[in-house]
């Protein structure tokens, strides 16, 4: 089974192995590629640019629209003051239903009403530009461990008063399980579903963020990665 895996469903695929840690930063000598973590992460710097593109599958039943790319260099991310920022208050990412629908209207205004009558998703595609990743790897949460009480819709503003949209903030809880791909290579993409319009499913979104790994060598190359966010539509599903 490929290591490039969709990490947003209610159950972790068999290729992902969960491990309990003896203490927050003690890893076993025979640790597999996926490890359970309860450690803080810190904010990473990013430069964003819009990537407009539109394609349709040969069957005509699915369409997607890639609308955002985040080129992420991690230079400066090792500064001491950044290391004090907790995970839930820094770079943890997910998407609220209101914010997701707003994105559809923002990027596909003429087709939004029709597209949102069917099932819609937002899926992020994350890939390192330099590998293997040693500095600030990407971590994802097992969605089945995220309680609704820990999800908080959060307004986004520009210049303090101009409403830009809505995302979500997530409260930390000891029951949450986090995973990361150790030594991720440039040919290994991570697909992360951050929103799904279909109701009643357990894998509705996958929270994710970068974190400061305690075993990163001092001279490890700074991480560089690209992230593309895709709008996905299913015309024959509700």
Swiss-Prot record:
InterPro entries: AsaB-like (IPR044053)
GO molecular function: oxidoreductase activity
Pathway(s) per entry: Mycotoxin biosynthesis
Record function comment: Part of the gene cluster that mediates the biosynthesis of aspirochlorine (or antibiotic A30641), an unusual halogenated spiro compound with distinctive antifungal properties due to selective inhibition of protein biosynthesis, and which is also active against bacteria, viruses, and murine tumor cells. The non-ribosomal peptide synthetase (NRPS) aclP is responsible the formation of the diketopiperazine (DKP) core from the condensation of 2 phenylalanine residues.
Family of this protein: Belongs to the asaB hydroxylase/desaturase family.
Protein name: Aspirochlorine biosynthesis protein N
Organism of derivation: Aspergillus oryzae (strain ATCC 42149 / RIB 40) (Yellow koji mold)
